[in-house]
């Protein structure tokens, strides 16, 4: 997979290309990265790529021509069809399902905005999709782009050492992940649940599913409203709800 970022701050991406599982996979050649600086495509010797907005208003707007040229340059680096994504609070929310869809692609171009935004004509002519990481605003698109990259890359075969790590993550199954424990057996008076030390894989799997359902019900009940439960999940969820009713009565 080739991922390119159109950004005026290429150095920010060192954190994802050099460190952790994504950095290791990058060194192994499982995925490639290129930062494309639109300043190199500016039509002035100072590299200005922004100007005042028509109609007035605060801040500056990133101009369409240098961004368009940067995107076209990025597309030309691969024979594969590229999907151009603009990281924007106005986009559709990034979900696990969307990350899984993007992980199937071979070439992504991530457009990282700055200042007050980007000329709308560039978005209409060159961007395939706008994606948001949440209902809040940050200073630029670089951090959202890296969050999207990390979410996508961990689903690419070969990047995680154990594919089960991705399969057991929160949202991969549509519900939140279960609690996890490691040594020591006791910490500040809290012991590791006995079932996890039993060696009974069937009981452990059922306990983990029950805890996932319990945590999802407490923290993200909206996920359960959208989910079609299998019989085992229905049984465990009914058990949890019955326990809650008994506590309240």
Curated annotation (Swiss-Prot):
Superkingdom as given in the UniProt entry: Bacteria
GO cellular component: cytosol
Gene3D superfamilies: 3.40.1280.10, tRNA(m1g37)methyltransferase, domain 2
Binding site for S-adenosyl-L-methionine: 113, 133-138
InterPro entries attached to this UniProt entry: Alpha/beta_knot_MTases (IPR029028), tRNA_m1G_MeTrfase_C_sf (IPR023148), tRNA_m1G_MeTrfase_TrmD (IPR002649), tRNA_m1G_MTases_N (IPR029026), tRNA_MeTrfase_TRMD/TRM10 (IPR016009)
Top-rank EC class of the record's enzyme: transferase
Role noted for this protein: Specifically methylates guanosine-37 in various tRNAs.
Protein name in UniProt: tRNA (guanine-N(1)-)-methyltransferase
Protein's organism: Neisseria gonorrhoeae (strain ATCC 700825 / FA 1090)
Gene that produces this protein: trmD
């Amino acid at each position: 997979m080739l991922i390119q970022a159109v950004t005026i701050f290429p150095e920010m991406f060192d954190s994802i290309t050099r460190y952790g599982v994504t950095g290791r996979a990058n060194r192994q050649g499982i995925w490639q990265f290129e930062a494309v600086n639109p300043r190199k495509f500016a039509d002035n010797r100072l590299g200005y790529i922004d100007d005042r907005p028509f109609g007035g208003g605060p801040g500056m707007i990133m101009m369409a021509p240098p961004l368009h040229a940067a995107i076209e340059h990025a597309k030309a680096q691969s024979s594969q069809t590229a999907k151009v994504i603009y990281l924007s609070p106005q986009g559709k929310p990034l979900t696990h399902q969307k990350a899984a869809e993007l992980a199937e692609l071979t070439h992504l171009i991530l457009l990282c905005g700055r200042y007050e935004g980007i000329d709308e004509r560039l978005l209409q002519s060159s961007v395939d999709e706008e994606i948001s990481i949440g209902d809040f605003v940050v200073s630029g698109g670089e951090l959202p782009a890296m969050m999207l990259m990390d979410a996508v890359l961990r689903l690419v075969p070969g990047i995680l050492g154990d594919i089960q790590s991705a399969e057991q993550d929160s949202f991969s199954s549509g519900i939140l992940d279960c609690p996890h424990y490691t040594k020591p057996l006791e910490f500040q008076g809290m012991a590791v649940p006995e079932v996890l030390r039993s060696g009974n894989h069937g009981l452990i799997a059922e306990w983990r599913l029950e805890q996932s359902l319990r945590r999802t019900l407490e923290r993200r009940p909206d996920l359960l409203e959208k989910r079609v439960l299998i019989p085992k999940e229905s049984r465990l969820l009914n058990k949890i709800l019955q326990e809650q009713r008994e506590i309240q009565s």
